[in-house]
Amino acid sequence: ILHTGAGKDLNAAKQPVVFEKNGQKVALIGATRVIPEAGWAATNGHPGMLSSYEVSVEPLLQQIASCHADGEKVVVLIHWGIERDEKPQEYQRALAKRYIDAGADLVIGSHPHVLQGIEYYKGKPIFYSLGNFVFGSSIPKTMLVQAAFTGESLSLQLIPGTSSGGYTRMLTDAESKTQFYQYLEGISFGVSVGEDGIVSPQP
């Protein structure tokens, strides 16, 4: 199983997983800003996770910049935030902007177990939390995001769902989808979600 965000040492932990399709390379880089014990973080000569705390974020930023310089589209997968809190912390918003300034094209967060909003920065989208894909507890709202890079453009479409009893189910009826999109717009930052789930910045 391909993985990113952890390894036998810091160099291994920061390595991306790179996919190529139709001549376009996409680099996925995983990291965390939630580490229960300091010893879980990867360092030179010590296995662990790629840390994204403010005092340890430089290796991640350097890896983002390196992938960007190689012509790859960069997706940062970041574990952060407060569990069950639908509002992103200010540090999440600040870190996401640092990732984008370093060259990231898309930021996708996890850990809160609930939806958090979407924001654009310099034309690049930030998904602060998608909710749960598969988890033991139940949450009424969760989602997937389909992201497609075409040249310099990125299209985004949401797949809304609900999760309970360890199962995630897609929403299928139009009314439930509309309510979901309206809710997500309400917790986001200057973002529009169309009836078809297409995400775009508000003009």
Language-model regions: role of each:
Residues I1-P203:
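Acidic, metal/ion-coordinating pockets
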